[in-house]
Regions:
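ABC transporter nucleotide-binding domains
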Residues: 1-138, 143-157, 161-163
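Conserved beta-strand-loop-alpha-helix hinge in the C-terminal portion
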Residues: 160-181
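Short, charged/small-residue-rich alpha-helical element at the C-terminal edge
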Residues: 176-249
Length: 255
């Protein structure tokens, strides 16, 4: 325990007391953002080292199984220091799997990964969940990737869980919204707010405005913007994604 709790309580596998937690924590594995391993050892040697720490019997059989699960069976004598970021992440997860956890906690596991490594990560997480029945808790700000591997979402703002929702519930609630692309974001925003009274979000990085109030159809919005001499690059309907849902929810909570 790093700090004493200020309030509230935590239950892990129905365990709440200090003595129960000691046993419950043995059922948990974790990788906190940056995987830790010995630079001068290869994947198999690193796993053998951690198997000794955990007093794992017949470690070679366990190591073969884990390397196959995380897709590192081909790395041979390659040292950890020479691994790509994706390979390091997979070895970190492999180390966490040595104790055969029922719960695996991953903090920002896809930060810095390339598209191929992200796809491999998704496949690995689904495999752990579907084939081994493992619960995987992922903390990440890359919501589009979370959506592809998760079945339940907890949305946190300023340290508080403000909403829990299943994937099925989200898909039932999600709606189309209007995407407006223009270089005149300030002028378009002012018109949407003052003349059309729309609920919207500005995405400066993409020169986009996302319009959520569908009381006005695209035709009416285009008509008013053109009248006010706003240059429209694109305007179209799009299905709401988890990122927009998150932003809307947080904005409404802060009002």
């Amino acid at each position: 325990k790093l700090i004493r709790p200020s309030q509230g309580s935590v239950s892990l596998f129905h365990s709440t007391s200090k003595s129960e937690w000691t046993h419950a924590l043995k059922r948990v594995g974790s990788v906190i953002e940056t995987p830790v391993a010995l630079n001068h050892l290869n994947a198999r040697q690193n796993l053998r080292y951690y198997c000794k720490i955990h007093h794992v019997p017949n470690p070679d059989n366990v190591i073969d199984e884990i390397l196959d699960t995380v897709g590192l069976g081909h790395t041979g004598k390659k040292k950890f220091r020479s691994f790509s970021l994706g390979m390091k992440q997979r070895l970190g997860i492999a180390i966490a799997l040595i104790a055969k956890p029922d719960l695996l906690i991953l903090d920002e596991p896809i930060n810095g990964l390339d598209p191929v490594a992200i796809k491999e990560f998704r496949q690995m997480i689904k495999k752990l969940s579907e084939e081994q029945g493992m619960t995987v808790l992922i903390s990440s700000h890359i919501l589009s990737e979370l959506y592809q591997v998760s079945t339940r979402f907890g949305i946190i703002d300023h340290g508080q869980i403000i909403r829990e929702i299943t994937k099925d519930e989200f898909e039932h609630l999600s709606e189309d919204y209007i995407v407006l692309k223009t270089n005149q974001l300030a002028l378009a925003s002012r018109i949407l707010q003052d003349q059309l009274h729309q609920h919207f979000k500005v995405v400066n990085s993409d020169n986009e405005i996302h319009i959520f109030d569908k009381s006005h159809v695209i035709k009416a919005i285009v008509k008013e913007l053109v009248k006010q001499e706003v240059e429209i690059d694109e305007i179209y309907y799009k299905r709401q994604d988890l990122e927009n849902y998150f932003t809307q929810l947080v904005d409404s909570e802060r009002r």
